[in-house]
Regions:
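Extended non-catalytic accessory segments flanking core domains
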Residues: 20-217
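N-terminal signal peptide c-region/cleavage motif recognized by signal peptidases
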Residues: 15-16
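Residues embedded in well-ordered secondary-structure elements
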Residues: 9, 30, 76, 126, ...
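Residue-level marker of positions within ordered structural domains that often coincide
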Residues: 8, 60, 191, 240, ...
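Short, surface-exposed linear motifs at loops/turns and structural transition points
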Residues: 214-277
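Bacterial N-terminal signal peptides that target proteins for export
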Residues: 1-7
Length: 277
């Protein structure tokens, strides 16, 4: 008896592909290190923050890290670009990133930049990591310091304190931290060896430090050369200008003295011919 045996082989092909996510918040909350995801949004940073770009949609923000640069892709993302990126989720010193293992970068033209979220320093945490924010009423304790690259600087606002980080590539390098109050924009980032805390703000150049007033004092008015009928007042401002003093024996004042220093940031006024008592 002849037996005819027919064997059927079924080949199954499994394709691994990234599933497009609904939003960046979904990626941040529901996916793990090593997962491949696709995120879409608007770029909020440029070379001032190095090769890293920050991407934000209506729900959250996230860092994109291409490695050394964006040379493998059609272009280098700039602020305002709308794009979609597919890659592996990684973490660098607490900062959640997509990359450097990127498999697709698609540009969609100009997007609509998100409005910076107004916060206080203490609100910089994981929920805002990767987002563009604004902190008003900022002052820097180290007034008179010139910014250097790869450095951090403390700041104060709303009775709270925070830290900014400035890379060598940032155009803030060489700028002076004055004693003037500013409203500051930047991206909330994180640098922590154990992954906890270490939140810092990343301003994207001088444009992100907005003076709170057109002119401000960088030193208080001081009195010197005190004599029976005269004394000297001196002070400094952030910009060059003419300095004057009004004085008198009543609320109406009535007498004006002009600084002898002229149109400069340093002002000196000599008040003479005064009456003792």
């Amino acid at each position: 008896m002849n037996l005819k045996l027919t064997l059927a082989f079924v080949a199954a092909t499994v394709t691994t592909a990234a599933v497009a996510q609904n939003n960046i918040l979904d990626v941040r909350e529901n996916y793990n290190i090593g997962d491949v995801v696709t995120v879409t949004g608007v770029v909020t940073s440029d070379d001032n923050l190095g090769s890293v770009r920050y991407l934000q949609d209506a729900t959250a923000g996230i860092a994109l890290y291409p490695g050394a640069d964006w040379g493998d892709w059609d272009a280098t993302p700039q602020i305002g670009d709308s794009l979609s990126v597919t890659g592996e989720i990684t973490e660098y010193n607490g900062l959640l990133e997509v990359g450097p293992n990127l498999t697709a970068v698609d540009f969609f033209g100009a997007g609509t930049l998100p409005e910076p979220l107004e916060i206080t320093p203490a609100q910089m945490d994981e929920s805002l990591e990767g987002q563009l924010v604004r902190i008003n009423g900022v002052t820097f304790p180290l007034a008179g310091t010139f910014i250097t690259g790869n450095s951090t600087y403390d700041f104060n606002a709303a009775g709270e304190s925070g830290v900014i980080y400035v890379r060598t590539s940032n155009t803030l390098v060489g700028e002076e931290l004055t004693g003037c109050e500013v409203d500051m924009l930047g991206i909330v980032s994180q640098f922590s060896f154990d992954g906890f805390g270490g939140y810092q703000l990343l301003p994207r150049g001088p444009v992100d430090l907005i003076p709170a007033s057109a002119l401000c004092y960088t030193s208080p008015v001081t009195q010197t050369n005190l004599a029976t009928t005269s004394f000297t007042l001196s002070w400094t401002t952030d910009l060059a200008c003419d300095g004057t003093i009004e004085y008198g024996l009543t609320e109406d004042l009535g007498t004006t003295a002009t600084a002898v220093t002229g149109n400069t940031p340093s002002h000196v006024v000599n008040l003479e011919g005064l009456e003792p008592g």
